[in-house]
Curated annotation (Swiss-Prot):
It catalyses: Random hydrolysis of (1->4)-linkages between N-acetyl-beta-D-glucosamine and D-glucuronate residues in hyaluronate. Residues 1-23 form the signal peptide. Gene3D superfamilies: Aldolase class I (3.20.20.70). The active site is at E135 (proton donor). Residues 427-438 form the EGF-like domain. Its EC number is 3.2.1.35. It comes from the Eukaryota. This is Hyaluronidase. It comes from Crotalus adamanteus. Keywords: Disulfide bond, EGF-like domain, Glycoprotein, Glycosidase, Hydrolase, Secreted, Signal. The lineage of its organism: Eukaryota, Metazoa, Chordata, Craniata, Vertebrata.
Amino acid sequence: MYHLWIKCLAAWIFLKRFNGVHVMQAKAPMYPNEPFLVFWNAPTTQCRLRYKVDLDLNTFHIVTNANDSLSGSAVTIFYPTHLGFYPHIDGRGHFFNGIIPQNESLAKHLNKSKSDINRMIPLRTFHGLGVIDWENWRPQWDRNWGSKNVYRNRSIQFARDLHPELSEDEIKRLAKQEYEKAAKSFMRDTLLLAEEMRPYGYWGYYLYPDCQNYNYKTKPDQYTGECPDIEITRNNQLLWLWRDSTALFPNIYLETVLRSSDNALKFVHHRLKESMRIASMARKDYALPVFPYARPFYAYTFEPLTEEDLVNTVGETAAMGAAGIVFWGSMQYASTVDSCRKVKDYIDGPLGRYIVNVTTAAKICSHFLCKKHGRCVRKHSDSNAFLHLFPDSFRILVHGNATEKKVIVKGKLELENLIFLINNFMCQCYQGWKGLYCEKHSIKDIRKI
């Protein structure tokens, strides 16, 4: 019945609604028929093991590591001291590994990184998210402002010590050149090593790409959320990084000042828009999968996101065509039994139900619009169309008790629902498929997979 609807409507939609926008093919999803995934990347093992509080993550379609641990087969995150000899200064002013990349042995770093990857990800068949979290310095000289200016000063002194005969201007030029060369080598070679050792993983750096659209505090009434032109240019200059990444991990953390505001959506939307742009320019064969990092609680607080801000984060991410979203959390989540219960109550309530809503809606749209061979993406990225279950057609039912739950989605897609999807969304076909509804095999692309 539903396929007949598509056949009957296809010609009309093509002539009247299809806006001719080309969408680059996507890599097939990590799990079959799961176009939008939600990951849990928080150290909440103690909730279950120590406090006997089961967070019910899998019940609500949330992908998690064994025992809800921070790192494992689903997602592994490498902090500065967990991977090789990352040169940096930590938040307490402690020096590590020569401080600046040009003052540390890359070979020694890579050798240690190899051991660390084998320790943290023992299986070569790992196909989860591999996230490198190096935030202390940025590989571009001009982006090391504020507290990161210390890396420029250290680099200048390093060049001065090695070349005292040079003028001050020559020293500064040399310092910038040597810093950016070494920073690029550290980041690029570490990434390539990880991909060589665990080739099925989704590898990238946390907070890349960034957008620097944080000016919502200074002039909230004039805030547009747009990425400054200079930051877009700087992101273009990082093409070497995007080409060697196999996934992108921007962040869309919301502060309380953005709570339930239009600015929250603007902030998230433009960060995602820039990430999707980078994802499409990184490769020629398919767009990189994008997995933005979000928090279930407002940044630096233990206050849960409002339902409106769940839409502004999870909902916006799915509608923009991302492959998924990662919820990061701190040790506070599992610090006490009360903390665990607070997290559990939020998951059992608004958070879990909304995740089920969006993941199911994304799957339904992929099934009926893209024949399971693609994911649904907004036709117009700035529209307010979301991948939500239609409330008149579907219900989310939660059965069970405090120790065991089961979530069931009941309902069926009606004709008017399908028309809404066709009018507002288009298919981003997975590799090996093409056509308006991803209904045609693409032999050339199949050979590349």
